[in-house]
Structure formats: structure tokens, C-alpha cells
Amino acid sequence: MPSIRNRLISSMILLSGITYCSTYAQLITIHKKEYRSSYDLSMLCPKQVWWTLRASDIGEVKRNPSWRFVADIDDPRAIARHSDYTNSGYHRGHLCPAKDRSYSLDAMRRTFATSNIAPQTPALNCGAWLMTEDSCRRLAVIHDSIRVLAVPIWLDRDTTFIGRHRLAVPHAFMKAAWLPQNDSVIAVWMLFNK
């Protein structure tokens, strides 16, 4: 039986009526305590990131503005770097938000990794995407624990590339939240990267 993650991705694509470009030939999975990332070496971007968010994960730790995103993938083909985003017009958009790991400085710091970011427009990153992050934290407080999935989406059309290493810019993002005890989906968002 397909996992809830795969069922959510398939359902969102069908409901949106978009044509989704999917290449799974070069995926590697990164397992971290804070999140899991299925990283696409051909796009130099996560294909999906998922994590459990508990009410106890949300704390008072503040992010340090001097933190840079580190290249954390032990594969010579994973060449995306913090500098690829510099002067590109795109933000380094967290998929698993730093604030979801604000119970500890070390946990928050570990979200600053290339396996956990994708190019997002400033309007999306500081607007609707931020609202999905806040909504998920509220849901975690209400339900004590939720699971979250964030998926960059490339449409069947021209793709923009940024940086020296040519990172592929997603056309849209999907995020979903569900209850771990019974896989009940409680929230789904589909947002265009503009």
C-alpha cells in the first residue's frame, strides 16, 4: 500500500490539474533527527521533505541571522551551495522550518542545510509559505503531534536555474499535514512560486 506521503502527492497533482515533471532516477534520502529529505541530484533540490512536529518541538530559541546553509549531503554530485542563492532574486526557503525545531539551538541549526531548502520567491517565502508554517505549528499545539510533508513541484514547462551550480527553481510547492495515529489529513496547501 502506498504511503500517506505518496498518496498525498498523487492526490494533489490530480486535483490541481497540472502536469508534473517527475524524475526519480537520481534520488538520495537524507535521514536527520529533525527531518527526512528525498534529495534530487538532477535538480539540486529536495524532491520532498517530511517530519513529525510535536507541540514540544516549538520553543523559544531564536535563529542567528549570521547562520549560513551548509552542504550536508555526502555525495559528490550534491553540489548546491549557500552561494548559489546569492543575488539570484530567490530566498533560501526552508522546507522543514527552523522554528519547528526551536526547542534547541542545535536542532534549529541543523535545519540550515542544503537538503532542506529550495529557491522561493521573497513574496512566497515571507507570505503564504510562512502562513503554512504558522498554521502547522498551531495544528501541532492543538493535536499534540502532526506529520508534515513539503514538496517542491516542477511543471511541464521551462524551468529557471540559479547559481553557479544551476539549481532548478520549483514552479510551485505543496504542503500537507496529517495526524500520525490514523493518517487523517487535516490541511493541504498548493502554492505557486511567484
Regions found by a protein language model. Give the residues of each.
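Bacterial N-terminal signal peptides
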Residues: 10-19
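Domain-level detector of nuclease and nuclease-like folds
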Residues: 75-194
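Boundary at the C-terminal end of the N-terminal hydrophobic targeting segment
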Residues: 21-27
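Short, His- and charge-rich active-site/binding loops that engage polyanionic ligands
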Residues: 28-91
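A short hydrophobic/aromatic micro-motif that marks alpha-helical segments and, especially, helix-coil
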Residues: 20-21, 109
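Bacterial N-terminal signal peptides that target proteins for export
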Residues: 1-10
